[in-house]
Amino acid sequence: MKAIILAGGHSVRFGKPKAFAEVNGETFYSRVIKTLESTNMFNEIIISTNAQLATQFKYPNVVIDDENHNDKGPLAGIYTIMKQHPEEELFFVVSVDTPMITGKAVSTLYQFLVSHLIENHLDVAAFKEDGRFIPTIAFYSPNALGAITKALHSDNYSFKNIYHELSTDYLDVRDVDAPSYWYKNINYQHDLDALIQKL
């Protein structure tokens, strides 16, 4: 099982690449890597990013998005890594701007997936908040690759586009025993300031 850290966004709203923003002296990407490593669930943790940022990561396992799908958002990152690892059975996807994700959240979602896998033949297990799914904290089966490829060849690169074609189930973020901010995206500097005040 592989983990994909999505870190290829332009971070326009934040003002600088979010992967290198810091919480308590630790970069977002380092923090997410450490959390994923702590679960002992993954045979490989891969950072998915763009050519401009790739050399800035102090981490050996960085993959640049497929050149045919540059600037097509997070689906391009998932697509690129799935194509490179056709034998892999499952991929966990997390956005780099979710620095407070916990190992407990990852393992809880995995247990949810496994418990529903056989009965429901799930392609995707994701979290949801107030009925809205969070596609960038989710497990994806390789079966999702077809729908992702189709979306990338259309003009609609949104996750909603692929979720309609896949067997998907959701776990509520409140089902995880963790601080309420564990799943929050940091989109703006004031989001980071607010998070730091809570810590």
From Swiss-Prot:
Query: Which amino acid positions bind GTP, per UniProt?
Result: 6-8, 18, 65, 97
GO terms for MF: GTP binding; metal ion binding; molybdenum cofactor guanylyltransferase activity
Q: Which cofactor does it need?
A: Mg(2+)
Record-listed Mg(2+) binding positions? 97
Q: Which CDD domains match?
A: MobA
Q: What class of enzyme is it?
A: transferase
Alphabetical GO biological process terms: Mo-molybdopterin cofactor biosynthetic process
Q: Does the keyword Calcium apply?
A: no
Q: What is known of its domains?
A: The N-terminal domain determines nucleotide recognition and specific binding, while the C-terminal domain determines the specific binding to the target protein.
How is this protein named in the record?
A: Probable molybdenum cofactor guanylyltransferase
This chain's source organism reads: Staphylococcus aureus (strain JH9)
Originating gene: mobA
